[in-house]
A protein has these predicted regions:
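An N-terminal, well-structured beta->alpha segment
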Residues: 1-69, 95, 151-184
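Buried hydrophobic positions in well-ordered alpha/beta secondary-structure cores of metabolic enzymes
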Residues: 9, 47, 85, 98, ...
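Proline/glycine-rich low-complexity loops and linkers
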Residues: 77, 132-165, 264-336, 342-344
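Phosphate-binding and adjacent anionic-ligand microenvironments
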Residues: 245-248, 288-473
Length: 473
């Protein structure tokens, strides 16, 4: 039996290796025990799954196990996006949600994501308890289950369709009339994932012309990771370049919690820029007011927007769970990460790629400009900022030397004085000219993730080289 370990987005593993039916049963029982210990079991649990192999089978087994210990399941009838599951959890005031997803990981992975009563990703104190309970049970038959038929008769199993309630919320947050009146054609790419029938349907119902690609169920995700990053959506970019009628391309990942945005000429727009553009748009055009939250790895272009509008930015460790806390507490207008996660005030404290895409569509429709033009306009007001991330692979010797290297940082990086060291997640060095470097060690492989940001594009490569030299030198 392999050790159960929860990461930033739950427990994930490769099919038939770590992710087995026996291990799933143990984790589900651990969640059930956790809910009983917290006195929440009577509120019931929302169960959902993405488009991967056996998602429905694992979910039904989960419902049988929960019923065996008296916990009701609200079972999503088809593969369902993560933000929709979070929305349903909050709407029903359930005890939590169990979501079978590995998000943007390749097809041979699966996972369990547990969301507590707050609706956001579980915080470490919750996942640590579940993890401890699960590992104590490995190899033991500790669960009992009852059939779904008997569970339904006892009021412990109910099949649900959460889509319409979610759509109702989106219609309060997004100006669909503005999108429709613009007359623009939008290309939509759910990457064969659980976002099928969401972006396309709600836009079409609003009267928007939609061009679809990769919109049928495929557990192999077309042979690529279901991640809407530039390198995995060449076909989508090609479609937009070849169809002059398309003004905007909107993509979501395997469970639709992340987004990918393509401009009218086929240019991929980095999530860092989308977050800053939407923050500016919500204040300047929608007349809203509030602070932003971003992870330590996310661009300070968000900070420049905040300074321009006289509001603040809250910096968090990597992981949307920390941003979700601010959304739950109604402390921010928008929160996001450079890894394409975003949500806003009044919505779920969970990444929502569907909402992010729709807000971008609204922004383009209202502003009547391309995203490249909008970014240029933003730069003219707050200044240019350029960001890049690379991975640095380590030898065993270099990996062993890292703790001492970070414990004794240099006074300078190149010719720039280090003015502040931030260690809430990794080691971030703020430099005197406003540029910065962040080093984050992977928890699963001998890799350091290097993030670099400068105020002009020409110096970005130099700063990356200096960061690489610091690690490898």
């Amino acid at each position: 039996m392999s050790h159960i370990k929860f990461g930033t987005s739950g427990w994930r593993g490769i099919f038939c290796e770590e992710f087995t039916l026996d291990n799933v049963r143990v984790v589900v029982q651990a969640i059930a025990d956790h809910l009983h210990a917290e006195g929440l079991a009577e509120k019931g649990v929302v169960i959902g799954y993405d488009a991967r192999f056996m998602g429905g089978d694992f979910s039904r087994e989960t419902a049988r196990i929960l019923a065996g210990v008296g916990i009701k399941s609200y079972f999503c009838q088809r593969d369902t996006p993560t933000p929709v599951i979070a929305h349903e959890l909050l709407r029903r005031k359930a005890a939590g949600a169990i979501n079978f997803t590995a998000s943007h990981n390749p097809y041979n992975y699966s996972g369990i994501k547990f969301s507590p009563v707050s609706g956001g990703p579980a915080l470490p104190e919750t996942t640590n308890d579940i993890e401890k309970r699960a590992n104590a049970m490995l190899g033991e038959i500790v669960y009992k289950e009852i059939s779904l038929e008997n569970a339904a008769q006892q009021g412990l199993y109910e099949e649900i369709d959460p889509r319409e309630a979610y759509f109702t919320t989106l219609k309060k947050l997004v100006d669909f009339k503005a999108i429709a009146v613009s007359g623009m054609t939008i290309a939509v790419n759910p990457l064969y994932g659980s976002g099928r029938g969401y972006l396309d349907r709600i836009l079409e119902e609003a009267g928007v012309k939609v061009v679809k690609i990769n919109d049928h169920l495929d557990p192999y995700f077309g042979g690529k990771p279901p991640e809407p990053a530039e390198e995995y959506i060449e076909d989508f970019i090609g479609l937009i370049k070849s169809d002059e009628s398309v003004v905007l391309g909107l993509a979501t990942d395997g469970d639709a919690d992340r987004f990918g945005i393509i401009d009218s000429d086929g240019t991929y727009i980095e999530p860092n820029y989308i977050l800053a553009l939407l923050f500016d748009y919500m204040i300047r055009r929608k007349g809203l007011r509030g602070d932003a939250a971003r992870s330590v790895a996310t661009s300070h272009l968000v900070d420049a927007v905040a300074e321009y509008h006289g509001v603040k930015v809250l910096e968090t460790p990597v992981g949307f769970k920390f941003i979700g806390e601010y959304i739950s507490a109604d402390k921010i207008l928008i929160g996001g990460e450079e890894s394409a996660g975003l949500s806003i005030k009044g919505h779920v404290p969970e990444k929502d790629g569907i909402l992010a895409c729709l807000l971008v569509a609204e922004m383009v429709a209202v502003e009547k400009k391309s995203l490249r033009e909008l970014l240029s306009d933003l730069y003219s007001r707050v200044g240019e900022i350029h960001t890049k991330r690379i991975n640095i692979h380590l030898s065993p010797q270099l990996e062993a030397a890292l703790p001492d290297k970070f414990a004794n940082p240099p006074e300078k990086i190149g010719e720039q004085q280090i003015v502040e060291v931030i260690q809430i997640d990794g080691n971030k060095y703020l430099l005197e000219d406003g540029s910065w470097l962040l080093f984050r060690k992977s928890g699963t492989e001998p890799v350091v993730r290097l993030y670099a940001e400068t105020k002009n594009f020409e110096s970005l490569a130099t700063l990356i080289d200096l960061g690489r030299e610091f690690i490898l030198g």
